[in-house]
Amino acid sequence: MKKFKDNIDDFFKWVKGSELVELDDIDVSEDPVRPELTLGFRIIHGRKIFGLKYNEEIEAIVCIALCPEVPHTVREMDYMSQAANQDGKRGEIVVAYTVWSRKRGAGKQTIFITKKLVKDEMKNINRFITLSPLTPIATHFHIKHGAKLININATSQNFEYDFN
């Protein structure tokens, strides 16, 4: 019983001590969801990379784009985020298009902290959507953490996290 309690205490210690930081460089080959997307793709046209940092280590990564509509493909997201960032405009929807973790529980924590950051600091944003692969793992992850399935597309699915 003590070992279990120690494991729980260790888990909550790292969760409480973690912070979300913006990254300008990652090893994209580590991305199990979209390794084909270059670093350059991930940091232009209002797209951002965030990492969940704990004890100087990045435990999870999420890549987001700002879009005016819900994209059904990476290509649509690319066009939408470019259009949303012309002439100082911004999209009203945050699209999390990849998330992965190096530590159990870090993916969930990253989604929730990113959602909070967006809600608190990006006042023009009114929705938090995913552009997820059509895999049981992605479906289970998002449903388990409270997202609602809003679209099933030919090559992807969209989930929406409540913004309240």
Regions found by a protein language model. Give the residues of each.
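Conserved acetyl-CoA-binding loop of GNAT-fold acetyltransferases
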Residues: 143-153
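Conserved beta-strand-loop-alpha-helix junction that forms the acyl-donor binding cleft
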Residues: 101, 128-140, 153-160
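Conserved N-terminal entry element of GNAT/NAT acetyltransferase domains
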Residues: 1-23, 164
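Conserved acyl-donor/pantetheine-binding loop and adjacent beta-alpha core of acyl/acetyltransferases
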Residues: 63-94
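Conserved GNAT-fold acetyl-CoA-binding loop/helix
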Residues: 17-37
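Preference for well-ordered, secondary-structure-rich cores of eukaryotic proteins
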Residues: 41, 117-125, 129-134
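A short helix-loop-beta-strand connector motif used in the catalytic cores of GNAT acetyltransferases and
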Residues: 38-60, 65-72
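Conserved acetyl-CoA-binding loop-helix of GNAT-fold acetyltransferases
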Residues: 101-119
